[in-house]
Amino acid sequence: MADAKFNVITPENGVPIKAWTRGVPLEDAARNQLLNVAQLPFIYKWVAAMPDVHWGIGATVGSVIPTRGAIVPAAVGVDIGCGMMAIQTSLNASQLPDNLHGIRDAIEKAVPVGRTDQGGANDRGAWKHAPEHHVDVWAGLEPRYKAILAKYPKLEHKQRVNHLGTLGTGNHFIEVCLDEAGRVWFMLHSGSRGVGNRFGTFFIELAKNDMRKWMINLPDADLAYLPQGTDHFDDYVDAVHWAQDYALANRQLMMQNIIRAVGESGLVPAFTSDVEVVSCHHNYVAWENHYGENVLVTRKGAVRAREGDMGIIPGSMGARSYIVRGKGNPESFMSCSHGAGRAMSRTEAKKRFSVDDHVKATAGVECRKDADVIDETPMAYKSIDAVMEAQKDLVEVVHTLRQVVCVKG
């Protein structure tokens, strides 16, 4: 293991943790979370920590958790199926207008963003009347949704079709980017919205109730699990796979609407948008075969990186992003980071940085510069360069992107 590109953390109890964190900080809180996960009796071989690893609600963001015989709903969390989509267009930088505000405005009119009215009837982040093609997509998702509700009526969420094709809040974004050759890309980041949140929250509590009922002691109550062979396990896996499909459809609809809106804006010449398409989940569960065994792999803030797999690793607002190709490294369970990773909490970022700091950090990017997005300022994140250097054995860079427009909720 002398030539290994990762550090090995060996807990007193449990499996090892292989951490691709050389040259990037690993906070104590995240390390402790990883040590708790490593103690679970159903972890397969080891836990893998990506270079963007940081403390998260429920489980560590940037972790890959392979399991046999059980699943931890909080390890997936509430933004089930969160992920990325990027499309290279036939446009180049010289064909964009000098003032990009009109492009940003066209995107913000085509995609509902943010959350207001506590998610109520006047929420600007949901469609008041879903477009017809969104209704058609929902029709394909609805039968499985109704089957889930038949068993768990409490999972019903009022914003179903009206959240399809919407961005959300937090670190979700839409960007117009330029690659190393000056080609224009559209890139976005979002998940399963309110429906997925309802699913995640419900099953996390269900698992905790099961632990109390069975009097099972855990190093962290958030690591409550559902044993394979139980109805709750099967029902959760079904629900989470449905939410992942919903999240993918959400991103696809947003991208379609963005392409149409920019194309109809009159600000750019006619273009095509099928040059290269990359799409990946980074908050999800999948059955996979590793070291000859079929296991459930939970990637919480990590991207599958089998040999040849294309993935997206975004930086922060004002930092580079990367289109990558997986190397299929078995030590990481064929995974890589999902971004730069937070260097501090949102609360800490708001205390530490000012609007002026944020304006300077996002110079040259058409984006929000107000106090409400300071928690997403580039300084709140780790260095994407250091993160990429730490995972050179996991992925190779295919394209380097820099954003020129960024839309946040």
Where are these regions (language model features)?
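Active-site cofactor/substrate anionic-group-binding motifs, chiefly glycine-
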Residues: 55-85
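Short loop segments at secondary-structure junctions
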Residues: 68-69, 90-92, 327
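Domain-length cofactor-binding catalytic modules of enzymes
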Residues: 2-33, 42-47, 57-61, 71-73, ...
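Compact, glycine/acidic-enriched structural inserts
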Residues: 83-120, 126-127
